[in-house]
From Swiss-Prot:
Residues in the signal sequence: 1-23
Compartment(s): Secreted
Gene Ontology annotations for the cellular component aspect, listed alphabetically: extracellular region
Record-given protein name: Otoraplin
Highest taxon of the lineage: Eukaryota
Pfam annotation, one family: SH3_2
All copies of domain SH3, residue ranges: 42-114
Keyword terms: Disulfide bond, Secreted, SH3 domain, Signal
Tissues in which the protein is found: Highly expressed in cochlea.
Signal is among the record's keywords: yes
Amino acid sequence: MTQRVYSIVLFLCFGLMNPFATGIFMDKLASKKLCADDDCVYTISLVRAEEDYNAPDCRFINIKKGQLIYVYSKLVKEKESGEFWAGSVYGEEYEDHMGTVGYFPRSLVSEQHVYQEANKTIPTTDIDFFCE
């Protein structure tokens, strides 16, 4: 009995400390995305936010008017869904959020500089919409 309790306690401790055990898979926003490369790691463009945006859930990022955002992928719009791009904020004043990649509405930003064309169409996967 003691060994069973000890095993359960260890399992709970390691399970709670493991960051992979705390995530959740959210609904897909699209089935395809456009990227600059096959792995979607290269920056497509730099955009500036034209309006503030409060993220409705963990798939999205908060953006402030005037903020610069690096774009890594562009979801292919489907039927009545919105058009969303994935990126991360840029700038020293936003260093707490730098590196966090999330979606934001394309309609709220203007492209400042295009680094590479997004000409690779890639299927989205569940991990594209995973939240920690």
